[in-house]
Amino acid sequence: MPPSRCNLGEQMKRIGIIGGIGPETTVEYYRRILDLYRQSNPDGGAPYIIINSLDMRKPLEMLTANKLEELATFLGEEVETLARAGADFALVAANTPHLVFDTIARQSRIPLISIVEATADAAKAAGLKRLGLLGTRFTMQASFYPEALAAREIEVILPNEEEQAYIHAKYMDELVPGIILPETHDRLTNIIKSLKDRAQIDGAILGGTELSLILRDETVFGVQILDTTQIHVEAAVAQLLGMSANANPNWPTR
């Protein structure tokens, strides 16, 4: 368990969260940040958390229309709302908006924690070499994960077109509204097994934060699961504590 790095005589950092994309995961981020922080600081303290919960329909419309500049402006304004509210740093509690993360980060006056960079660092630290990627179709068809992982000499393998369509449909129609079905869980795990059988993946990225609500095992058919929600949370709490997440492999887990 990592040691406490805060005391009552210090000014505690405030974390800002862009949430609502989707709502179920925003609740999960809040709970996991609280749990991990309290386990790291058993003095009974709790972190300052500022949540800016959005109506996900607006950014989803921009994504569907490929209006990425408009999306970056929209999310940048919401990050500024967090900064004005007193956040010292922030994160976007979703994978897909990281399509425009670099633009938002350049414009932001507070630091932002990238779920993509944190996940790529975690994959490298785990010694993984070939990763399956599951997420929305926007994430699976984007370059941000392959580029971040290629920089660490890790290859990304995508599901086939039919599997991608299935994952995206179940993600939007079931997971975003919080519907968890055992048959969907089984099909998702079989997709991971299929990737292992045909491409010899040794890890799989849950490249959609809602996926962590249905795939909770650390391994699936011998494939290590990279829960991007948990990785992002660990990076955020590390920032709160003034620590390096990768330097602390023994974080308490959920």
Region spans (language model):
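Non-catalytic structural scaffold of enzyme domains
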Residues: 7-254
